[in-house]
UniProtKB/Swiss-Prot annotation:
GO terms for biological process: tRNA aminoacylation; tyrosyl-tRNA aminoacylation. It is found in: Cytoplasm. This is Tyrosine--tRNA ligase. Belongs to the class-I aminoacyl-tRNA synthetase family. TyrS type 2 subfamily. GO terms for cellular component: cytosol. It comes from Geobacter sulfurreducens (strain ATCC 51573 / DSM 12127 / PCA). It is an enzyme of class 6 (ligase). Keywords: Aminoacyl-tRNA synthetase, ATP-binding, Cytoplasm, Ligase, Nucleotide-binding, Protein biosynthesis, RNA-binding. A motif ('HIGH' region) lies at residues 45-54. The keyword Ion transport does not apply. Residues 341-402 form the S4 RNA-binding domain. PANTHER family: TYROSINE--TRNA LIGASE (PTHR11766:SF1), TYROSYL-TRNA SYNTHETASE (PTHR11766).
Length: 403
């Protein structure tokens, strides 16, 4: 494949390539010498399950594998114990070594549903970071100033608002950057929220006399609410280890616009095919539900196999036929919180009933369903995260999104 064709594939879905000309030169050199580029992406095992948001990077890594390059799946077992402060307004709670290692094992099992195990190097950053003594850590810290760290948006805001910033949080970008030095990475992939850290890696490589890595930032996949990035803590995620029926059903619940976004970042369809689908939805020649089914089949098949994808679609169609959930319904957006909210209250706020007491009676009488499942507990409380489709009677629906 020509360098131009490689660049076209690499650029798909990417937000930024720093520096694009450098990447072209690296690809040209690789083609001439036959030496593959080292492509690095790091994942801190702070939770046991990967979700579709993580797979945006994994799909880009797979594309590099298909182009013949070496992919390094870096598990941040050392940095995971620090906790990435990116985007946080307060210091994150550190995980124990045992928690990190347990989560890391599940990561290794899950990533090979996407990556080719024969072409993937799995590395743990404790291999080199645990060997850094006090002198080495001080030497690393000397490479950057506090003023430069405060240029990072989240640190700057916390400092301006007189919120505490722990010293170890300043070390995180340096340690992540040092990973690139240890691996001699040619390219590092990361979400747009990681741009500062990725650029630190470039600077540290220059300090160590290495060719600076090319940085490719990928978008943060929106969760089911279409607003916030996909996150387990927000409840708006699709885990790749979830049952096939749940994955398919969640994909069918997203908006049409978000569906097209998922196609671009998660599917193997070409951009021309996706653009054709977008046009078809606009002119009415493509029904959005059929397009979502196609996406659901592709995603489920990737993680559970083609047979499971077919079964999941059939299960959804039967449930949809029985429930007759409409495409259009009243929508209500509420603030996501850590608290739970009573279902009877949601019925009233969505305008499906006139009062909380009427909502409780409706639940008692078996006239209420949540996401297609009938409920009978009048005291039921729901987590104030994610998306719920609430049905009252046969024809009254509301979609409630916590964002």
């Amino acid at each position: 494949m020509s360098v131009a064709d490689q660049m076209a594939l690499i650029k798909r879905g990417a937000v930024e390539i720093l520096v694009e000309k450098e990447l072209e030169e690296k690809l040209e050199k690789s083609a001439k010498t036959g030496v593959p580029l080292k492509i690095k992406a790091g994942f801190d095992p702070t939770a046991p399950d990967l979700h579709l948001g993580h797979t945006v990077l994994l799909h880009k890594m797979r594309q590099f594998q298909q182009l013949g390059h070496e992919v390094i799946f870096l598990i941040g077992d050392f940095t995971g114990m620090i906790g990435d402060p990116t985007g946080k307004s307060e210091t994150r709670k550190a995980l124990s070594r045992e928690d990190v290692l347990r989560n890391a094992e599940t990561y290794k099992e899950q990533v090979f549903k996407i990556l080719d195990p024969e072409k993937t190097r799995v590395a743990f950053n404790s291999e080199w970071l645990a060997k850094l003594d006090a002198g080495g850590m001080i030497g690393l810290a000397a490479k950057y100033t506090v003023a430069r760290m405060l240029e990072r948006d989240d640190f700057g805001k916390r400092f301006a608002n007189q919120l505490p910033i722990s010293i170890h949080e300043f070390l995180y970008p340096l340690i992540q950057g040092y990973d690139s030095v240890a691996l001699q990475a040619d390219v590092e992939l990361g979400g747009t929220d990681q741009k500062f850290n990725l650029l630190v890696g470039r600077e540290l490589q220059r300090e160590w006399g290495q060719t600076p890595q090319t940085v490719i930032t990928m978008p943060l996949l929106e969760g089911l609410d279409g607003v916030n990035k996909m996150s387990k803590s927000l409840g708006n995620y699709i885990g790749i280890n979830e049952p096939a029926d749940e994955i398919f059903g969640k994909i069918m619940s997203i908006s049409d616009e978000l569906m097209l976004r998922y196609y671009e970042l998660l599917s193997d369809l070409s951009m021309a095919e996706i653009d054709g689908m977008r046009t078809g939805i606009r002119d009415g020649s493509v029904h959005p539900m059929e397009a979502k089914k196609q996406l659901g089949r592709e995603v489920v098949a990737r993680y559970h196999g083609a047979a499971a994808a077919t079964d999941a679609e059939e299960h959804f169609v039967k449930r949809f036929r029985d429930n007759q959930t409409p495409d259009e319904m009243p929508e209500l957006t509420l603030a996501a919180t850590d608290e739970k909210v009573a279902l009877c209250r949601l019925l009233a706020e969505a305008g499906l009933v006139k009062s909380n007491s009427e909502g409780r009676r409706a639940i008692q009488q078996g006239g209420v369903k949540v996401n297609g499942e009938k409920v009978s507990d009048e005291s039921l409380e729901l987590a104030a995260t994610g998306v719920y489709v609430i049905q009252f009677g046969k024809r009254r629906f509301a979609r409630i999104t916590f964002a």
